Amino acid sequence: MRGMSYNITHECDAINILSDNLHEGAISEDMVALSGPAIELLENNVGSSKNSYQEDEGSSSIDENAPLISIKRKRRIRTVKSTSNKELVQRKASKPTKQKSVFTPLEQQYLELKKNYQETILAIEVGYKFRFFGKDAKIASEVLGISCYFEHNFLNASVPSYRIDYHLERLINFGLKVAVVRQTETAALKSTSSSRNTLFDRRVARVLTKGTTLDDSFFRFEQTQHGTLQASQFILCVADNVDKSKAKSGRVQVGLIAIQLSSGTTVYDHFQDDFLRSELQTRLSHFQPCELIYSNKLSSESVALLNHYVSTEKTCGRVVRVQHAVQQDVKLALENLQDFFSSKCIMSGSKIIELHMEKVKSLHSLSIICLDMAISYLMEFSLEDLFVASNFYQPFDSISSMVLSKQALEGLELFVNQTDHTPVGSLFWVLDRTYTRFGQRMLQRWLQKPLVDKENIIERLDAVEELAFNSNSQVQAIRKMLYRLPDLEKGLSRIYYQRGFYKAASAFSKNSYSCFKSALLRRLIQQLPSISSIIDHFLGMFDQKEAENNNKVDMFKDIDNFDLSEEPNDVDYELAQEIRELKMSILMVRTEMDFHLQELRDYLEYPNLEFSIWGNVKFCIEVSKGCKKIPPDWIKLSSTRSLFRFHTPKIQSLLIELSSHEENLTISSEKIYRSFLSRISEHYNELRNVTTVLGTLDCLISFARISSQSGYTRPEFSDKELLIHESRHPMIELLSDKSFVPNHIHLSSDGVRCLLITGPNMGGKSSFVKQLALSAIMAQSGCFVPAKSALLPIFDSILIRMGSSDNLSVNMSTFMVEMLETKEVLSKATEKSMVIIDELGRGTSTIDGEAISYAVLHYLNQYIKSYLLFVTHFPSLGILERRFEGQLRCFHMGYLKSKEDFETSVSQSISFLYKLVPGVASKSYGLNVARMAGIPFSILSRATEISENYEKKHRNARKNVFIRKVAKLLMILNAEEIDFKRLFYDLTAFEEI
């Protein structure tokens, strides 16, 4: 195929030409076909059908599997020799030959490697480049925007070695799995080996995906950008089991394991879920995994939800990789785990193995199955050792914190706003003033799971108050320490996986600080010195300058003076001896090179002769062109107008010997460095604890910086009362250029527990109820709240039902989703819950919506008795104030009405006051919003007329239907019989509305 070029104008010609060349052996099948997942990735993410596979203008698009076309838009395949269309037609008509393709040694090596990595992109080190072949080259060219060309039997693409990390990051962020294939021998070592005339040995050095990459950015200082969310690197493994006895109801048991390798976090969970998979949705919202692992045994409903998550993330520019795994039964999974821990902990003894298995057996069977799948998956990347650090298995749920649902996270805009789905305008954007990346991640976890234990909350608030209003040197010292810390959490994972050490260790080597008044601060600060002796010991072995430059050859201070007779140190003795010998050999070669230089000076009669470097070639001899003493056996390297560059045979021999010693020294130094890191890993748990301490301090200081602002107050807590004076919305007051209108609220378990809030559209109803929930989350996370004063109960949950959206992944309409979410709220609410229901029933007809809203509001007040904020556009619900007198009160958002001439029509204009006022608003004034949006006056006039006529005509009929529907719904919600006499009495006020 080499040297051929095509000008294809018809798809049939392309197919025939491709077929002919396959018969001739000019193109290998591996070069032609893309795997299904790869095609899907290219179609979905690059838009190949529109741009990538087009020939010259006016030509038809051809099969995307054919490698005969331009790979990068607006770039042409390089050709060596052209073939005319006539020659192609003649070739097509001729009988195909049966001659097989002759692969080059490098191509054969690629094919051998590819056998074990069919669904993986291979980046193969060849000299100073990394090359891609066949279908890998095609994908790489599309994703990276590099040229793709034929050479011998395969498509080829390449990138320079010094840019490989940048390109690898782009490939894995595209959702691909990439294997880095490196040369295991250098030219210097190859030239001295018995296999010097054979191909370089190449092996897979590492396999990378988005979730298995240990970020090299740890070695670069990265100041946190306030309010920016870091990309999640969680890998989520899911398994479920449909309960046959409850199959019709859609109930299912779900187990999961979530892994974040960069921070060394492993989370397990098991729960019962419904048809909507609302609990699984909540976990997805918390973890935001970049990789999903599941088997074909997963239920169709769960698969549909995961697919919906993948597509949703894709619309936001994030690619989620899906890995299908083999799911074993729990018995075989336990056997696999027993074998795994036995092999990993063989040196630690049977007790350690028993402890690991005891932890595993305490998990639910589905979580055990997920753990087995997760370990099997990570073995491909040599990262399975994470699970040996069993101290950091964490349950998703905790009795000391609440878990906010997906609806709460999204509806309250905790991490992204609902307009453009960016962090700006979210609660996290307001509160994030952290200094470190790991502190920023911890703050995110704090907001996802506010505390429910009063003592823990008060401890945090005490610490925040002291940090906010204590300007002494101790606080400043802590801030200064945190300010320049790298990402220690990721750095520790790199230590554990033997990727790096010095900067992580030096960051931990800090002085302790004297005690604070806060018990939490004292406890945190006192933990820092506990690790200092370990850190100081390790740091004492390093040459700081060489370690910071990552020079492993000269990194250790005492390796040259290492005495084999001393007691064992933290380095390997045999390797140390080998390193000393190699350094001595290098010194001897360099000394001999100096002697040879003196010989050359004498021979050439040039006493100032020195070795020079030409490019990457060392020890060059430069002589003028007029020199007559050049022996014939000298090797000419290059020349200029005035001089020649040579190597003598002796220089070449010594250079080969020197390069061999230097390469062996690098290899031995790498080995001793990894041996050293394995000793450090024994202290991983202690280092991890200190990282947690520093992250906690960072979060507390972040809260302190917010809490010290004017208008923020420390919340107090009560078992029976919610009383906030001049409550404000933390995000709106920052985003708006107008002064925010504060509001008061007073709820009590012994008195009014429910507010029924009505009012005009855009009047601030939703913002008001959201700001109360946000204040509760801030208070229970340990932060001051935006108010003049705040007295709050400690809520065990904050349940939200607001907004409207369908769920096409499980064929659910907007109204069905609305009802299922309402059912979820009703099933989880307790008397200690804050419940927010916003505009329930708007996904169906008006009368059905009214009836459902009435029944749900009645049920929550009659039986659950939560702290309830019920926002509605149905003023008829105000009759429940009489039914639940002293327990429910009606309020509306204040407004002013005025009559304005609207050209030929008259329309009411509304001015919003954003103030909570007692009573029910008789209308929602939706036409006013239409007026503000610029709807033509003729339409507004007609709509006003129709609205008034409809109200007059259907009022009585609606009342009777409404009563029947409410009675039926209440009977469904309650097992008890309905008191119809009381119900009709309560509803008599309906006639007046």
Swiss-Prot record:
Q: Which GO terms describe its biological process?
A: gene conversion at mating-type locus; maintenance of DNA repeat elements; mismatch repair; mitotic recombination; reciprocal meiotic recombination
Q: Name one GO molecular function term.
A: double-stranded DNA binding
Q: Does the keyword Heme apply?
A: no
Q: Mispair-binding domain: where is this region?
A: 97-211
- Which cellular compartments is it found in? Nucleus
The record's section on Pfam families has: MutS_I, MutS_II, MutS_III, MutS_IV, MutS_V
| Binding site residues for ATP | 759-766
Which residues fall in a coiled-coil region? none
Q: What InterPro entries does the entry give? A: DNA_mismatch_repair_MutS-lik_N (IPR007695), DNA_mismatch_repair_MutS/MSH (IPR017261), DNA_mismatch_repair_MutS_C (IPR000432), DNA_mismatch_repair_MutS_clamp (IPR007861), DNA_mismatch_repair_MutS_core (IPR007696), DNA_mismatch_repair_MutS_N (IPR016151), DNA_mismatch_repair_MutS_sf (IPR036187), DNA_mmatch_repair_MutS_con_dom (IPR007860)
Q: Name one GO cellular component term.
A: nuclear chromosome
Sorted UniProt keywords: ATP-binding, DNA damage, DNA repair, DNA-binding, Nucleotide-binding, Nucleus
Function as written in the Swiss-Prot or TrEMBL entry:
Component of the post-replicative DNA mismatch repair system (MMR). Heterodimerizes with msh2 to form MutS beta, which binds to DNA mismatches thereby initiating DNA repair. Msh3 provides substrate-binding and substrate specificity to the complex. When bound, the MutS beta heterodimer bends the DNA helix and shields approximately 20 base pairs. Acts mainly to repair insertion-deletion loops (IDLs) from 2 to 13 nucleotides in size, but can also repair base-base and single insertion-deletion mismatches that occur during replication.
Q: How does it assemble?
A: Heterodimer consisting of msh2-msh3 (MutS beta). Forms a ternary complex with MutL alpha (mlh1-pms1).
State the family named in the UniProt similarity comment for this chain: Belongs to the DNA mismatch repair MutS family. MSH3 subfamily.
Q: Which protein, by its recorded name, is this? A: DNA mismatch repair protein msh3
Q: Which organism is it from?
A: Schizosaccharomyces pombe (strain 972 / ATCC 24843) (Fission yeast)
Q: What is the lineage of its organism?
A: Eukaryota, Fungi, Dikarya, Ascomycota, Taphrinomycotina
